[in-house]
Amino acid sequence: RDVLGSRGLGDVYKRQDREYLRSCAEEHDLPFIVHETSFDPSTDTRKSPCFLCSWTRRKALFEIAKAHKCNKIALGHHQDDILETLLMNLTHQGAFGTMPPRLRMDKFDMEIIRPMCLVEERELIQVAAWKGYRKQLKNCPYESGSSRSDMKELLRSLEAINPEARYSLWGSMTNIQEDYLPRKIR
């Protein structure tokens, strides 16, 4: 069963984007479900507002999918999103990890898939322009100056140094040479 989803938007733009998404869903004969979410960033100051918002929306997606007897959720993360997350985890968490193309969520008896994981953001922008899709308006108070926007800029800088940098970063996730990495010191 197919379900078309959207992420949270500010009130000013919400109606415009909602109607645009509704018309896209109708055009493709997909059900259109609206579910409002909210969060309070002061409830957990250890986590960034971006993480809390994302987790709140993701949890709602799991609940809605479960209610509609779905066992997979397809998310629109593209290659840039995955590489930016890798860079964020390396620089902010000291961890080598990112969003995998497939992730089994046993707690929710659900699988997340990311079918656009190999597509670059710039390619999606070109296809959207060619197909005449309207860009979704965002009104996130935390977006500018976020770690993700810093990582987007870092990825651009790495590509300026080496045009193949994104492909090297992508390949590094499956080419881990453990013999050449430090071991945990006891």
Region locations from a protein language model:
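Active-site adenylate/phosphate-handling loop in enzymes that bind or generate adenylated species
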Residues: 43-45, 51-123, 169
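A generic structural signal for well-ordered alpha-helical segments
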Residues: 24-26, 65, 128
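Single conserved hydrophobic/aromatic residue that forms the stacking wall/gate
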Residues: 2-13
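Short, well-ordered secondary-structure micro-motifs
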Residues: 14-16, 45-46, 85-87, 179-182
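A conserved beta-strand->alpha-helix junction
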Residues: 19-44, 144
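ATP/NTP-dependent adenylation/nucleotidyl-transfer catalytic domains that generate, transfer
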Residues: 97-186
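Short, surface-exposed alpha-helical segments at coil->helix boundaries
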Residues: 15-22, 121, 125
